[in-house]
């Protein structure tokens, strides 16, 4: 499932399908923890935050989490819907305001928990503070198919 928000339905989908289904939030939280993360910031849509898929994934493995404050979250929503989905360049001041908010809350890593936010990583060459949920899913899907992932930045 290549949509973070759709993981709200993961348990029902996984139970109904005859094939294994990878869980992007759980895999991302586990990879963040394996990379030494103690508190994961969640950059995602309001829907993903309300669905609590990342919060639950973090809680289940003993990883602390934080979401941006109200104003910073409005900025993330604007980036996703008013900029990326409209084919516009991302206002990095808005993005950095959300990142600063997560740093202030003690996060040592942040998940790009919306597929559109992967484009920010690509275009702005974001550093190791960020873990891209789309990349995590791709890597785990490749491994599930018996192929070792190559070509990803670490």
Regions found by a protein language model. Give the residues of each.
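Non-catalytic structural scaffold of enzyme domains
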Residues: 1-154
């Amino acid at each position: 499932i290549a949509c973070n928000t759709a993981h709200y339905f993961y348990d029902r989908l996984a139970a109904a399908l005859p094939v294994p289904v990878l869980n992007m939030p759980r895999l991302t939280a586990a990879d963040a923890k394996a990379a030494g993360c103690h508190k994961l910031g969640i950059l995602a849509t309001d829907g993903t935050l309300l669905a609590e898929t990342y919060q639950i994934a973090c809680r289940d493995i003993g990883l602390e989490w934080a979401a941006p404050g109200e104003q910073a979250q409005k900025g993330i929503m604007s980036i996703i819907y008013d900029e990326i989905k409209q084919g516009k360049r991302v206002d990095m001041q808005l993005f950095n305001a959300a990142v600063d908010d997560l740093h202030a809350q003690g996060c040592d890593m942040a998940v790009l928990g919306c597929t559109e936010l992967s484009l920010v990583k690509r275009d702005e060459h974001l550093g190791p503070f960020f873990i891209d949920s789309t990349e995590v899913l791709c890597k785990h899907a490749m491994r599930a198919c018996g192929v070792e992932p190559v070509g990803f930045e670490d």
